[in-house]
Amino acid sequence: MSDDIATLKDEIRKLNARATQAKMDLHDLSEELPTGWKTILEVAAKTHEAHEKLFAARERLKTLEKGV
């Protein structure tokens, strides 16, 4: 089970990097408005998806750690 936890922690690190980059992309877009306004939904959806995956992985990790 510790291998599962280690694998999940590695996945969380990668997901965290993606979520952070998506957050920065959204922030950059907000500073460029109104230029680029047509990409708001696309960038926001990407950011939402990245954070959704990150938080789901964190919940799986909590569940695994409770079972140890």
Residue ranges and their predicted role:
Residues S2-L29:
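N-terminal acidic leader/helix
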Residues L26, A57-L61, V68:
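Hydrophobic alpha-helical membrane-spanning segments
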Residues E31-T63:
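Short, charge-rich amphipathic interface segments used for partner binding and complex assembly
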